[in-house]
Amino acid sequence: MSGDWSIDLTDFTSLQGILDRLLRETQTTPDLGDPMVAYRYLNARRQAMKDAYKQRPLLRIWDKHHRYIADLAGEKSVVVEEVMADSGTATVVIKHSNWLSKFLLYDRRAEEDIQFTLDPNPTNRSWQNRWGGKIVNVNAVRDKDGLHTVELEMVHNREHAKHILGGANPLLPPEIQFPKMFFLPWNMRTAGSIIMFLNLARQFFPLLSIPTNIFNPGAWLGVRDVIGGLNPLAWPIQVQFVNPLFDQSRTTILSSRWQDLHTVLAAPMQDAGCMLRAYTWLTEDDTSPHPELGALGDALARPTRNCVVFAFEDKSGVTGPTGTLIDGPLRLIAETADDLITNVIVPPGMYDEDGDGKTDPLIRKWLGFAPAKPKVVFREGEYTGIIDAKRSMKGSTAKTVMTGSRSPAWLNQLQTFGIKYGLSQLSAVISYVLGAYQQPGTPGLEELYQGQLDNTLFAWQRFTDPRRVLLMGDLGFLEHFEQGQGTAYTSAGILDLRNGHWKTRAFVSFKTSIRNGMPWIADEHFTLGDRVAFQLGSVLHVDQVSAIRRSYDADSPLLVELSLGQDLDEEDPVAKAMRTLAGFWNLAGTFFGSDSMF
């Protein structure tokens, strides 16, 4: 073995010598030939990273135009949470004697916004890990012991997405809307940034904001700075630039008709494995919040003011074979084929190589679109970072699924035609037998039938899963009724049976909480929405970081908690595939003049 493995103890004669040596070793590249020096360097570096996130966070408040007011100090307790698919919340409690209490309670109008930011690492502040939000409620509280406090309730800046409407045609005023619905087929990140940019332009871009609010002059106050509004980097709310040529996210169809963008984007982003994150950027930050615009130079890509930047991020873990926008439609085909074929033909648990209880992607693996294995893995052991984990195995709740209440329309029409035709022939026979003159009551005899027998034939549909019958045994739950569309023996009825079959299936779900820094550090090795793995028993389960929560108070140190997965039942893959196909069908309808679109 090469290298000198002896240990140098010359500086260990005094405590000061030890400290000087440790400081010198953490600031310079270690001598890899000395294992103790290399170990101390790596250990000190790891500990420094952990300690950096144990500092008291930097809390600041800002005015309605996001201009600095003051640092918030002397807090009694702080709880902030950022959520992947919704608006996170925060609560800060300060003493009533705090000098900011009077300002927050009395020295401002209730309509005036106050912004709040929290930097988890005050010595290395960055827009990428900053929590930014709006104070929505200020409570003056007196408890039973006579202690007066002020409680600040905040909501994360992602809440803005719930208050931006997606216009049917954002380039025209609401009084003139043609076509009746906005449709955009594109890769998810690009499509999301386009629809949000257009609807922000309605608010901040003077050449668009004034014409689209021609009958609403009050909105003109939002573009007081006409010259500055021409620059999207000067808007208070911005969209992170996405290079459409290298956007590999899954192709989707976005449609809106004056719904809020949170609702418009929720299902397409879930299907594409993307998330919408709201960053709070300050002019003090070293880097631009538009990294894909960096080819122009960081100076040209920097916003000109403090702002909120919405970013569409692909967290699916999938990278396509071409590395370009072509991967989007190819991935759509592969995933839809897996949803429609693999999850229907392959019985649950038959193709599950990793043992996590979910059918592995088969067609996606063939075409090169299977998600990559996560780099961050939390394992069980004596020093594990897993706080608690729960594996739930839910049994099947029905052998038979039933749906319906109405017969197919064509069957009711055929039945009506047959009965009315028979009655009309009966009327002719009566007239012939009783004489060649009109008999009272015979004309219009067929009009006696007014659909009394509609929805009596093939109005109900059932499906019994033979595999469940054998596995559940004699005492298994028997039946489940799925409401659905209510028409049996149609494509809608078949989908209703499938939905009911999915809801009553046996499945395995997981939920876990992770302690930060053991060994992975949030916002250093991974961030919100990233796919990480955690060990439960002998199986590694993969899920996304759905929430990051930071809390501390006067008696407890800073605690960072991570939530993996969501408390939502996994969606039926066939329903996802049908929603995708329906989107393309509706898009075709717009070109052929469908009444629902034009």
Locate each region found by the language model:
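Broad, structure-driven detector of short, well-ordered beta-strand segments within folded domains
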Residues: 274-281, 401
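Generic detector of short, locally flexible boundary/turn motifs and exposed helical patches
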Residues: 22-25, 52-59, 114-118, 241-243, ...
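A generic structural signal for ordered alpha-helices
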Residues: 70, 182, 239, 246-247, ...
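Assembly/oligomerization scaffold segments
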Residues: 2-225, 252-258, 262-272, 278, ...
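Short, conserved helix/loop micro-motifs enriched in His/Cys and acidic residues
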Residues: 231-252
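Glycine-rich, flexible loop motifs
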Residues: 221, 226-235
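Beta-rich nucleic-acid/ligand-interaction surfaces
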Residues: 283-298
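An acidic/polar, Gly/Ser/Thr-rich interaction patch typically located in mid-to-C-terminal regions
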Residues: 74-108, 254, 263, 321-598
